[in-house]
Swiss-Prot record:
One of its GO terms (cellular component) is endoplasmic reticulum membrane. There are only 11 differences between the sequence of testosterone 15-alpha-hydroxylase and that of coumarin 7-hydroxylase. By site-directed mutagenesis it has been shown that modification of position 209 is sufficient to convert the specificity of the two forms of the enzyme. Liver, with a strong circadian rhythmicity. Circadian expression is regulated by DBP. GO terms for biological process: cellular response to cadmium ion; heme metabolic process; response to stilbenoid. This is Cytochrome P450 2A5. Its EC number is 1.14.14.1. It holds the Pfam family p450. It is found in: Endoplasmic reticulum membrane; Microsome membrane. The modification N6-acetyllysine is found at residue 379. One of its GO terms (molecular function) is oxidoreductase activity, acting on paired donors, with incorporation or reduction of molecular oxygen, reduced flavin or flavoprotein as one donor, and incorporation of one atom of oxygen.
Length: 494
């Protein structure tokens, strides 16, 4: 008994010393880091966080520690930036220092620092420069891609008409349509809406995207080193990501076999040609792994964010039929019913532009932003961030900054209208992030949102299964991504 008691005392003493050493070490490391709650060994600040409401948990901590604070997601040390001023200071005023890519554990299982989105340094710069130029070559920002979007909008409207006013879940109607625009650029062709492989790909994208917003997805962000070896829903997300990579690899292999270096058909061909041009360059970033994963980056990002934003937008417009009616009125007055909307019409449609911006602000697709990493020891305000420190630029806190939006929790297009009813820009409108690593698909996404929404609303009224006052527009999940509620609706011809 005495021996057991001594062993217990020794074990408790040993653990106490470990905790004290950990706290001392963290304080030493964090001597010039922003303040924050004291972490525990391995679990960090897990006990102070609600993984079902990670964004809200972090914002609650900011109320105590200020707009710049330090948090430990398990063993991961993160500096969190809240509000327009702090985020702009970092991502714009000190853009180079904050240009590294931080961890996104679920996607990092596959990407591991490759591809244009999840890479850093020279790799990220080269892939980004190439991707922007190639997208432009294939019509992004030009009349060519506008015609492609209008063509796809026509297919979508036909699909909605075939429902004959029945109540449907619009999720895959929208993702098929939006995905076909980016597919025509990266693969050189669109998919048939009933293509089983296409629908399987869309389910894989939706599934892995939604996992990042779940409680388990946020838990995986903290403890990925252990959880990646354990059973659980993360394994399904990995399976979906692997399925997407396998599909892209198959597409690339087909393009390799049929490549004409003098006549690129799509993004994949352009990358393959660049690989041939640089095959003798030992420092090239143009090789198969970056091709497959950059293509997957474009395919994934070009599908999920815009389609989910539209899905949230439909719900918001059913909640606010007065706003829907004003958009209908502006469409009828500026465009009429006899021609398709054009992107240039937005210049004469301030109310519709304001509504689209407010949908994006309210939907807040990536509330914690894509994690950044400082590329060197960085002085930020009164703090010193050691090289490699991860940073969360809380885009949601900018989109809801009360200094810039009078009623940030309310859906109100007046946030983007001046006293004369004209559209006004807002420095806190950052759904595509800001600085050197802003989303370079922003121009395409803006065009898609305007053309798809106006084409649909030119042809249909929206009808919910519920009265407007009973519609709940609170997000279903909020983690890495914001996921709107699941609902059904009817498209009634106008």
């Amino acid at each position: 008994m005495l021996t057991s008691g001594l062993l217990l005392v020794a074990a408790v003493a040993f653990l106490s010393v470990l905790v004290l050493m950990s706290v001392w070490k963290q304080r030493k490391l964090s001597g010039k880091l922003p303040p924050g709650p004291t972490p525990l060994p391995f679990i960090g600040n897990f006990l102070q966080l609600n993984t079902e409401q990670m964004y809200n948990s972090l914002m609650k901590i900011s109320q105590r520690y200020g707009p710049v604070f330090t948090i430990y997601l398990g063993p991961r040390r993160i500096v969190v930036l809240c509000g327009q001023e702090a985020v702009k200071e970092a991502l714009v005023d000190q853009a180079e220092e904050f240009s590294g890519r931080g961890e996104q554990a679920t996607f990092d299982w596959l990407f591991k620092g490759y591809g244009v989105v999840f890479s850093s340094g020279e790799r990220a710069k080269q892939l980004r420069r190439f991707s922007i130029a190639t997208l432009r070559d294939f019509g992004v920002g030009k009349r060519g891609i506008e015609e492609r979007i209008q063509e796809e909008a026509g297919f979508l409207i036909d699909s909605f008409r075939k429902t004959n006013g029945a109540f449907i879940d619009p999720t895959f109607y929208l993702s098929r349509t939006v995905s076909n625009v980016i597919s025509s650029i990266v693969f050189g062709d669109r998919f048939d809406y009933e293509d089983k492989e296409f629908l399987s790909l869309l389910r894989m994208m939706l599934g892995s995207f939604q996992f990042t917003a779940t409680s388990m997805g946020q838990l995986y962000e903290m403890f990925s080193s252990v959880m990646k070896h354990l059973p659980g829903p993360q394994q399904q997300a990995f399976k979906e990501l692997q399925g997407l990579e396998d599909f892209i690899t198959k597409k690339v292999e087909h393009n390799q076999r049929t490549l004409d270096p003098n006549s690129p058909r799509d993004f994949i061909d352009s990358f393959l040609i660049r690989m041939l041009e640089e095959k003798k360059n030992p420092n090239t970033e143009f090789y198969m792994k970056n091709l497959v994963l950059t293509t997957l980056n474009l395919f994934f990002a070009g599908t999920e964010t815009v389609s989910t934003t539209l899905r949230y937008g439909f719900l918001l417009l059913m909640k606010h039929p007065d706003i829907e009616a004003k958009v209908h009125e502006e469409i009828d007055r500026v465009i009429g019913r006899n021609r398709q909307p054009k992107y240039e019409d937005r210049m004469k449609m301030p109310y519709t532009e304001a509504v689209i911006h407010e949908i994006q602000r309210f939907a807040d697709m990536i509330p914690m932003g894509l994690a950044r990493r400082v590329t060197k020891d960085t002085k930020f305000r009164d703090f010193l961030l050691p090289k490699g420190t991860e940073v969360f630029p809380m885009l949601g806190s900018v989109l809801k900054d009360p200094k810039f939006f009078s009623n940030p929790k309310d859906f109100n297009p007046k946030h983007f209208l001046d006293d004369k009813g004209q559209f006004k820009k807002n420095d806190a409108f950052v759904p595509f992030s800001i600085g050197k690593r802003y989303c370079f698909g922003e121009g395409l996404a803006r065009m898609e949102l305007f053309l798809f929404l106006t084409n649909i609303m030119q042809n249909f009224h929206f009808k919910s299964t519920q009265a407007p006052q009973d519609i709940d527009v609170s997000p279903r999940l909020v983690g890495f991504a914001t996921i709107p509620p699941t609902y059904t609706m009817s498209f009634l011809s106008r």
